[in-house]
């Protein structure tokens, strides 16, 4: 991790988890494929494309979650896509093209998080080592931190009741696509497929 933001109190963790179990869990899908196969998850607000042929989708609308992540995000970081997960691991990966270098993670439960800090800056640097020794973080719940989404990272030993809230702002490489999507969304010009928030990812 690059920057530790805060620790959420146990009381507030329980309030958040109760809300997620009641309001988010019924809408979640089980990821059928990819590096997080079998994990429960739900995109909030916007579901970005994970490859060059995929479309932008709307996410599930939950303003309470969006307001919360905005309230704890550091200055200069704008939450634009949020993925809520429950249980499940994810294999070593870098986040896709849509993701800006800086991302935020909110951990609510026991999990082991691995991170290879090959790039210590939030921008592209040439001639970096492709792989460096991974740092291991045994998280217990309440941790909020920033990390470089383009550095390899993964999750193991996730407790079945562990929740994660992962937050991105959109990269400059896909900013024009995102703004066009948001304009089409505001004007009611999205396809039926794009209006389906139950899409997989990772």
Task: For each feature predicted by the language model, list its residue ranges.
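Short, conserved beta-strand element in jelly-roll/cupin
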Residues: 83-86, 96-113
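Short acidic (Asp/Glu) patches
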Residues: 65-67, 84-94
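Beta-strand elements of modular eukaryotic interaction domains
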Residues: 93-96, 104, 135-136, 156
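A short glycine-rich, His/Asp/Glu-containing loop-to-beta-strand
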Residues: 71-86
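Extracellular structured ligand-interaction cores
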Residues: 76-78, 101-103, 162-164
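Catalytic core of Fe(II)/2-oxoglutarate
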Residues: 118-202
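Non-heme Fe(II)/2-oxoglutarate
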Residues: 1-73
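Nucleic-acid-interacting cores, centered on viral/eukaryotic replication and modification enzymes
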Residues: 1, 88, 172
């Amino acid at each position: 991790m690059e920057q530790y933001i805060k620790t959420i109190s146990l009381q507030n963790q329980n309030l958040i988890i109760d809300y997620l179990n009641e309001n988010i869990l019924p809408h979640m899908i089980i990821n059928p494929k990819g590096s997080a196969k079998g994990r429960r998850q739900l995109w909030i607000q916007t579901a970005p494309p994970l490859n060059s042929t995929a479309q932008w989708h709307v996410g599930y609308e939950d303003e309470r979650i969006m307001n919360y992540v905005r309230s704890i995000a550091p200055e200069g970081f704008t939450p634009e896509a949020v993925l809520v997960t429950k249980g499940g691991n994810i294999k070593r990966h870098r986040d896709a093209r849509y993701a800006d270098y800086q991302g935020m993670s909110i951990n609510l439960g026991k999990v082991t998080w691995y991170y290879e800090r090959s790039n210590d800056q939030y921008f592209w640097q040439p001639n970096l080592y492709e792989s460096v020794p991974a740092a291991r973080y045994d998280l217990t719940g309440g941790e909020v931190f920033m990390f470089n989404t383009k550095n390899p990272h993964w999750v193991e030993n996730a407790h079945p009741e562990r929740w994660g809230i992962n937050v991105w702002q959109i990269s400059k490489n896909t900013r024009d696509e995102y703004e066009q999507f948001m304009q089409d969304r505001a004007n009611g010009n999205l396809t039926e497929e794009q209006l389906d928030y139950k899409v997989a990812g990772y």
